[in-house]
């Protein structure tokens, strides 16, 4: 009898400690279960005195891998998921409450307009919440500057948005991805980074999306701001040196909230013996805008100018940029009279981003030129 009472008591205690006294468990779908686990994990480790940073992963070399640790070029980009990227840098938990989500996992040459819109909309949604203090986007370096500038024009918040990548895959000896990611999270959580537009962090440097560009095919110091200089540096602490003067983020005229697609804008590269047929082909393919990467100060050959003039008369906006990599493309009276616009100091790939967004607002050449002068 005594043994039976002890058994009943033991069973009751077990019932309480295992939570069986609660109502029956509701069965979750695998998707719901995964979401619940993710939220629970984040809540359990969250520190109230640290900034909440969301990492949005898109792929690229930073998510690349290869069987050889010595390979820095023969790897596959976009194969490592966001959770693995976060787990590889546990030190981030000391500077921020970090959570992540996978937007896509591709090499950045495969980032298209649909992905750009998806990313910008997701960032705006997240930053509208008081629970998110900053965003880090992991991205391939090949087109990183294009995405960065697009976000610089379309994010509607002064909270920090930082784009980060790497030049070596995650499996390489001395991979630069973990350090870059740590620094990006640090910058995204810094109060001083607010109001500076979209920033790019690699190789201990902080750059403005407006001016930064990739300058080398393989080296880790590939991103430069050339004549304009870096916004800041990271040496344990963050040091901001320059202010951003061009309009950006919440001060721009552009919004992606109601956009499902962007106008087709193509880039034509100028060279000796180029011809009007290049413009004809772009117009025939459906281009609403064309950026011409001209020689020198956005110069066109006679043949190219004929093609550009023809495109404008068919309702296509043409913007002159330069293939030189530096300098301002200045207005030219002869070109201006034909509505061949000047990109100011935007390189061709960034001029394309601005022109796509400008064309969602207007087709007026003077208004579009004003955008290039402002942004």
From Swiss-Prot:
One of its GO terms (biological process) is asparagine catabolic process. The active site is at residue 61. Residues 1-19 form the signal peptide. PROSITE patterns: ASN_GLN_ASE_1, ASN_GLN_ASE_2, ASN_GLN_ASE_3. Keywords: Hydrolase, Signal. Its EC number is 3.5.1.1. The keyword NAD does not apply. Homotetramer. Catalyzes the conversion of L-asparagine to L-aspartate and ammonium. This is L-asparaginase 2. It comes from Bacillus subtilis (strain 168).
